[in-house]
Amino acid sequence: MDKQTIINKIQKLIRLRDGARAVGSEGEANAAAAAIQRLITEYNMSLSEIEGTPEAEEESCIGRSNNYHTADNYRSGWKRHLLYAICEYYYCKAYMLSGTPRCVVYGTEMNRMAVEYAFNFLEAAFTHLSVIRFKEAHGTCRIPTRHRDVWLASYLLGCSSGIREKLMSEKTEQVTGLMISHGAMIDKYMAQEQGS
């Protein structure tokens, strides 16, 4: 496919995603967003190429996100593992703030937005599912709180590990090259930030 055909296809998917969100079809919006991400990654494109606007060029610069609270009630570190996996998939880097349960994310504006959306969505979904799965597994049995917490921590850690495996299995050699490029830009930004 030539570049313009790919750009047209991505623009149609963006309109589909926005339309699905407007009518409240979260599943269709997520499917369209995943297809957009896959095409952008596969063909090594940037948002500025798709939108063709100077504003999009400005969005591609590296920046730092707000703090992500990664502490969890079970001290298993599942939120941190989830954030790291999502960051790696979206060409960002996450770092723990010393002495706190918080992380910051470095990357392009669009990638950081994707990380924030995916992290918030998956964190809420996994937390909700963990309670449902616990009730399915144990029914009406009385389980000590400590055992329940261990079970939930194990389930949530398994969810974050499963997401990591799924995201990493979708990578190709082209994606690896793009990751190295973004990694170098992030390292350069961090060096400049520390130097000033």
What label would you give each PLM region?
Residues 23-27:
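Short coil/turn segments at helix-helix junctions and helix-capping linkers
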Residues 6, 10-20, 39, 129:
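Non-transmembrane amphipathic alpha-helical segments
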Residues 1-8, 45-196:
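Extended, helix-rich structural scaffolds rather than catalytic motifs
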Residues 10, 29-43, 155-160:
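Short amphipathic alpha-helical coiled-coil/interface segments
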